Amino acid sequence: MKFYNREIETETLQRIERLSKDNAQMTVITGRRRIGKTTLIRHASTEIPFIYFFVGRKSETLLCAELTDIVKETLGEELGTFNSMSKLFSALMNISCRRNFTLVFDEFQNFAQVNDAFFSDMQDIWDRTKDNSRINLILSGSLDSMMNRIFDDRKEPLYGRATNRIKLQPFTINTLKEIMSDYHPEFTADDLLAFYMVTGGVAKYVEQLVIQQAFTKEDIVKSVLGYGSYFINEGKDVLSDEFGKE
């Protein structure tokens, strides 16, 4: 599926990228699961080296090894071996004092499970280094409750550190009309209503219907309720992510 909408968000991220050539930027991007944050971030990156890192719920040592490999591949920088994400982040901030690049931590809130001291360490490193840094740091997260606490709670170490905030919203009905017009120009009002009711404008759900070529009301219902449907376990997965598994 081609990239739709998000013109304002794309322009904003590209402006921030340009600003990072002279001053460090910390951008926080929030929005519900499957809304298209990662796709937007990748789409908006244009001119400088781009490091994308998904913060999985793994051991800190393993995450460090994965990130150092990505840094070596992207920047050609040999960082050695780390078992502390704080020390690795400090090394990356030092590199950013001589090189401009984008660093994305996707599902940033997961660091709370990896090492709950990381946020305090990050605040200290950022405060000491940012004035000489040219990093374009993007911190993306799907769990609004945790992301809001990390960045909006005055008691939290990263409170007030973000230089930019973006909250990604679902596609509007006009964008859904555009998508339907591109893929199924003869759509009816009932088709559009079903398309909206099932997806809610969530980019991943829209993409799934496009992949299934489900554009009529009848085909949309079959795609959602049919055997092996992507949507069958989605509600449970969303609740598990937000509130934890039993």
Model-derived regions, located:
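Phosphate-binding site recognition
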Residues: M1-E246
